[in-house]
């Protein structure tokens, strides 16, 4: 999205959500000074928090990651959710650094964890401050993470199947693990397909198969391969999911 498109989208979302649920907005990058400038000069009205990804490409040290998020926490007018996704950034933020940030800054309130490292995730969940939340950043491990103590997910598949996937999350959070597990297994093949050609392309293909949108993306993203599209359509048909 261009800067102007982001402003339009933000305005639309603030109006549509109308305070019914907390609204997170992405604000991150690998140029700390630029992120801090955006936080200080941007319009954050109607936004309840920011989701800030680990700096990508630079491959910062653990101390570099700490200092990056320290600067963001000190500049942000709203709460900060850390985002650890080494598969996209090229760097993993350790449990130690995540916990250090959680303890040192009251406005760092959560982490979206997509490392897939269950030992690391357990370390964070076990040792975190009481008022710091762990959110899954990977749909496929959301159910097991909630059983370990995570409190939710920032989802990909939820863009296409919000009702059913959020039902699974609510069931798990309420301790109804048996029925939550049924939904988890029901979607297991879709979870895997999300990564075959990239999850942006996959969720777009899902919405297209449901008759909701055109199967179009902006470069450098392209639609899924035909074989992937056919598998997605077949699974949705088997699950009797349609718009």
Per-region residue spans from a language model:
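A non-catalytic, amphipathic alpha-helix used as a structural packing/dimerization or gating element
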Residues: 5-8, 12, 37, 71, ...
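Active-site beta->alpha loop and helix N-cap motifs at the rims of alpha/beta catalytic domains
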Residues: 1-90, 100
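Flexible C-terminal active-site loop/helix
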Residues: 212-243
């Amino acid at each position: 999205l261009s800067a102007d498109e982001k402003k339009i989208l933000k305005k639309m979302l603030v109006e549509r959500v109308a305070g019914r649920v907390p609204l997170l907005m992405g604000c991150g990058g690998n140029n700390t000074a630029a992120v801090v400038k955006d936080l200080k000069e941007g319009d954050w009205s109607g936004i309840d928090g920011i989701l800030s990804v680990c700096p990508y490409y630079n491959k910062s040290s653990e101390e570099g990651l700490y200092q990056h998020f320290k600067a963001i926490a000190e500049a942000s007018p709203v709460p900060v959710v850390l985002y650890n996704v080494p598969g996209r950034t090229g760097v993993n933020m350790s449990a130690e650094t995540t916990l250090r940030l959680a303890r040192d800054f009251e406005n760092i309130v959560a982490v979206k964890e997509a490392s897939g490292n269950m030992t690391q995730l357990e370390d964070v969940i076990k040792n975190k401050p009481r008022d710091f939340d762990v959110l899954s950043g990977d749909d496929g491990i959301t159910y097991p993470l909630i059983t370990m103590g995570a409190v939710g997910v920032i989802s990909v598949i939820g863009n296409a199947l919000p009702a059913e996937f959020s039902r699974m999350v609510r069931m798990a959070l309420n301790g109804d693990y048996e029925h939550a597990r049924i939904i988890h297994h029901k979607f297991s093949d879709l979870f895997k397909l999300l990564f075959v050609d990239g999850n942006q392309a996959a969720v777009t293909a899902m919405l297209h198969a449901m008759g909701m949108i055109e199967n179009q993306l902006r470069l450098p993203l392209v639609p899924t391969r035909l074989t992937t599209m056919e598998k997605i359509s077949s699974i949705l048909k088997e699950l009797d999911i349609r718009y």
